[in-house]
Design a protein with these regions (language model features):
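Short, solvent-exposed amphipathic alpha-helical segments in soluble enzyme
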Residues: 22, 70-71
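A structural signal for short, well-ordered beta-strand segments
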Residues: 5-7, 54, 79
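A common structural junction motif
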Residues: 71-78
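Short S/T/G/P-rich N-terminal loop/turn motif that feeds into the first structured element of a domain
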Residues: 1-50, 59-62, 84-85
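Short, electropositive alpha-helical surface patch
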Residues: 55-68
């Protein structure tokens, strides 16, 4: 299944200028995705809006939820199943 995931945070919680937090966010998500059989198909970022977007392939919604678990403290997540047209 494909999923469109939108992450949002605000200026105060932005990781752009906090290297340790950025590494925790990136490493935590990458490792948890691999551990839960979630493939990161594409990554996009709207820096001005503090909004990263991912296209993920996963067996189910639960796998995506588990992959995001280590980074939940960094903001909000909207997970939407999608399909190719």
């Amino acid at each position: 299944m494909l999923f469109h995931v939108t992450h949002t945070h605000d200026y105060q919680t932005c990781m752009a200028h906090r290297e340790e937090a950025r590494n925790e966010f990136n490493d935590g998500f990458t490792k948890a995705a691999a551990a839960n059989n979630v493939q990161i198909m594409a990554t996009y970022n709207n820096r001005g809006r503090h909004t990263p977007i991912w296209i993920l392939e996963a067996p189910d919604y639960h796998a995506v939820d588990k992959a995001l678990e280590p980074i939940l403290k960094f903001g909000n997540y909207d997970i939407v199943p999608v399909s190719a047209m």
